[in-house]
């Protein structure tokens, strides 16, 4: 595995920043639980609860709608590694190249590798209607957001941090898909907390998207 290459890539994206790690653990845990709850379970500590591979395999089954190979139920380390490998092999079968994420790191509870794996799963399975092959998954997600929000005043999505601080991009995405849920014309850049809370409340109540982000965190952090 080329750990150096992966770490450099994650460093550019801010994934190695301690504040990012804390926020992403919270966000990714909420995302995982929004799917795992459909199978009657959940996780609490993201780097611990995927270590035996069972909930990781279950998560992939829930979000893909496809069965994975039968998991090993043994408690030994090699059973856990076998289960995580089944999950990783499934992800790779979907055309995702896992540069440096190995089963051992997940079984050992490596926070950075676990977050990187979940981020990879989100990009591959949560954003499926973008097929610009030459772009990275992150760039495809950015392009999708730009396309959806292009018609809206005061929205200019250039990144995944400062472009979202005033809440208008979130509101624009909701309005683009469900215009009856909010009146975009009444929103202003001057009230970011209102915009963010409105978007998150509507997403949770009407779109079944769990509230994963905190409006105050986004508004007051230098680079959310």
Regions found by a protein language model. Name each.
Residues 1-224:
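Alpha-helical coiled-coil scaffolding segments
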């Amino acid at each position: 595995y080329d750990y150096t290459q992966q770490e450099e890539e994650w460093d550019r994206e801010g994934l190695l920043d301690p504040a990012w790690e804390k926020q992403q653990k919270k966000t990714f845990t909420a995302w995982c639980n929004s799917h795992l709850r459909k199978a009657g379970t959940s996780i609490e500590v993201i780097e611990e609860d995927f270590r035996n591979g069972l909930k990781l395999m279950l998560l992939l089954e829930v979000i893909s709608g496809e069965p994975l190979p039968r998991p090993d139920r043994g408690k030994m380390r090699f059973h856990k590694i076998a289960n995580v490998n089944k999950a990783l092999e499934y992800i790779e079968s979907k055309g995702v190249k896992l540069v440096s994420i190995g089963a051992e790191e997940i079984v050992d509870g490596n926070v950075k590798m676990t977050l990187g794996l979940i981020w990879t799963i989100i990009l591959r399975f949560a954003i499926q209607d973008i097929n610009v092959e030459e772009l990275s998954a992150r760039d495809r997600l950015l392009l999708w957001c730009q396309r959806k929000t292009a018609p809206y005043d005061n929205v200019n999505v250039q990144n995944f941090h400062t472009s979202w601080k005033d809440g208008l991009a979130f509101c624009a995405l909701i309005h683009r898909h469900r215009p009856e849920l909010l009146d975009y014309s009444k929103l202003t850049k001057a009230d970011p907390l209102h915009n963010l809370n409105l978007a998150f409340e509507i997403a949770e109540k009407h779109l079944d998207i769990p509230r994963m982000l905190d409006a105050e965190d986004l508004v007051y952090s230098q680079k959310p």
